[in-house]
Structure formats: C-alpha cells, structure tokens
C-alpha cells in the first residue's frame, strides 16, 4: 500500500493519502491496511477496541457535527468530497483549542484522535463517508458536541446552499460552553 502522510495542525490528527488505480471500469483503492496505518502513526491500540463501522450517505450541503463522543475515528470518503473541520478539545494537548479544516476525497484517510471534535459537510449530492469508531453508539447516551454554526469558531462551511443540519447537532452546545465544561472538569 502506497500511503503518504500530510502535515496537519493538530497533534495526532493524521491525514493519509493512497493512490486510486483507474481503468475502464472505474477505480480501485486499498482503503486501509492495519500495518500501514500503524506505520504512519495510527496508535496500535486503536485496533484493540470495540470497533464499529458506520456509513453515512449525505445530500449536498448536509453538515454533521461537531461531534466529540470520546472515540477515536478513522474516516474515509467512498464517494464525493467532504469538508471536514476539527477542534482539539484535549486540555493536555499542545494544540488544545486549535482548529483546522480540509477537503477530503476518495483516496484520503483521516485518523481523528479521541478528544478532537469533528464535523463533515458533503460538498456533493449523495456523498458517502465511511468511518470506524472505537466505541459502540448508544442512541440513549448524551454525547458532547459543538453546534457546527458556532459564531466564535466561524468554520468555513460551504454556505452556497442552506446547510442541512439535524436538530440534535443544531442544538449542541456552543464552543465557549464546551470549553467551560472541559476546563471545570465537569462532564
């Protein structure tokens, strides 16, 4: 597998690229291989967790996030382009409160460490996002999140159309409220 690693601004957030092999049928991609991911910085213990694989298919403009469920994630795009934004919420991190955004396409994998909030917006109709998380989703559990349209964060979402956002995400806490919770050690 021919991975390359790109620089990013948040400690532990990895952006990896792998070539797409095109022919008359379309393309083939080795999405990920455990040994290569470890070689490029994904912690080996990521694979020791109760892993759950999720797939979301999103209409153009759909904005999911900013989620911080306390899991690490390995995110790949199966179809389309997603604008992804990340906020480091790990108080012990040298990049605490740092924000970075990038457009992710097929052939790219993003490893999101536990404690880094993340959101994704589909820039195409029927964008397909695949992600592996280190915990099982429980719909009855309240997870930490930041409203994706937080004015202080002012994330560079595509606003050429009205974003489609779930009520739950829209009603998430503000960035300042989440920081206050984290800095008071109250969860």
Located regions from the model:
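Catalytic Cys-His active-site segments of thiol-dependent hydrolases/isopeptidases
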Residues: 131-132
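Conserved metal-binding segment of the jelly-roll/cupin
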Residues: 103-125
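Non-catalytic, conserved peripheral segments adjacent to functional cores
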Residues: 1-104, 126, 135-141, 146-187
